[in-house]
């Protein structure tokens, strides 16, 4: 079965939100969105970032507790001498774990190189579809057309206030406000482990230069990420394996993505 793909068109906006011209997008923005592939590759990339963990083999076993035996009218759990306090067993306070985590456990999932490439293309295609972006929960003005492509000079924005003003002019700052309002304290022990707050995902800005001033300028805006087009992956484009992140491209980043992906997939 062959799919006939039609190239999409998009407006190029300047940093004031004015339409400069219309351009034809690379074919990678017209591919069908493969949710199954995006999920598979997301899990593979995410699990490769996990660190193996284990437990001290003697944890919970540093005690002289032994069972008192039978026919005493009490449970046969190991007990500390002279106190009768239960210890060592998995169902006791301070006892060992029945099945502790092992450093030998295989955490990382695998995916093929071609699957990874096609998953990135699928995720890019979803950013060009307003239905996927809305389904992800992003908020923006009704006048916004997808994908959002802007001129290269936006990478020279040096202050957070300039980036904030730029996002307002292109109609996506409401999404930053949504993230701000929904930052909340995490449930559970993660609060004690350096992960106190949970922050929703906001807009993604894809640039063509890793030394762009906008990278530092935008990092203080809630939920906003700035990534080089050479490094962008499913992790950035489809957080949680949910495609359709609100994404802003610079004109040159589109060309880099085209060179990186089109030649290897489209024959």
Swiss-Prot record:
Gene Ontology biological process terms, A to Z: translation
UniProtKB keywords: Ribonucleoprotein, Ribosomal protein, RNA-binding, rRNA-binding
Gene Ontology terms, MF aspect: RNA binding; rRNA binding; structural constituent of ribosome
Cited Pfam families: Ribosomal_L4
InterPro entries the record matches: Ribosomal_uL4, Ribosomal_uL4_dom_sf, Ribosomal_uL4_euk/arc_CS, Ribosomal_uL4_euk/arch, Ribosomall_uL4-arc
CC per GO annotation: cytosolic large ribosomal subunit
Domain of life (superkingdom): Archaea
Subunit structure and binding partners: Part of the 50S ribosomal subunit.
Similarity remark: Belongs to the universal ribosomal protein uL4 family.
Described purpose of this protein according to its UniProt entry: One of the primary rRNA binding proteins, this protein initially binds near the 5'-end of the 23S rRNA. It is important during the early stages of 50S assembly. It makes multiple contacts with different domains of the 23S rRNA in the assembled 50S subunit and ribosome. Forms part of the polypeptide exit tunnel.
Protein name in the entry: Large ribosomal subunit protein uL4
């Amino acid at each position: 079965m062959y799919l006939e793909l039609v190239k999409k068109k998009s407006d190029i906006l300047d940093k004031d939100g004015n339409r400069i011209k219309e351009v034809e997008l690379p074919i990678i923005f017209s591919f069908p969105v493969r949710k199954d592939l995006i999920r598979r590759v997301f899990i593979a990339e995410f699990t490769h970032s996990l660190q193996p963990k284990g437990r001290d083999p003697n944890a919970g076993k540093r005690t002289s507790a032994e069972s008192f035996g039978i026919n005493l009218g009490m449970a046969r759990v190991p007990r500390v001498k002279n106190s009768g306090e239960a210890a060592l067993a998995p169902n006791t306070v301070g006892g060992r774990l029945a099945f502790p985590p092992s450093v030998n456990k295989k955490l990382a999932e695998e995916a093929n190189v071609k699957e990874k490439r096609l998953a990135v293309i699928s995720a890019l295609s979803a950013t060009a579809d307003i239905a996927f972006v809305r389904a992800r929960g992003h908020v923006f003005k009704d006048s916004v057309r997808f994908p959002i492509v802007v001129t290269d000079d936006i990478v020279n924005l040096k202050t957070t206030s300039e980036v904030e003003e730029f996002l307002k002019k292109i109609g996506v700052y409401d999404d930053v406000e949504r993230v701000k309002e929904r930052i909340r304290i995490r449930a559970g022990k993660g609060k004690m482990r350096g992960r106190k707050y949970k922050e929703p995902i906001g807009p993604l800005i894809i640039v063509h230069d890793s030394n762009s001033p906008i990278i530092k300028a935008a990092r203080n805006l809630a939920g906003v990420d700035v990534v080089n087009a050479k490094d962008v992956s499913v992790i950035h484009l489809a957080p949680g394996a949910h495609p359709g992140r609100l994404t802003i491209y610079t004109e040159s980043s589109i060309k880099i993505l085209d060179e990186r992906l089109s030649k290897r997939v489209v024959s």
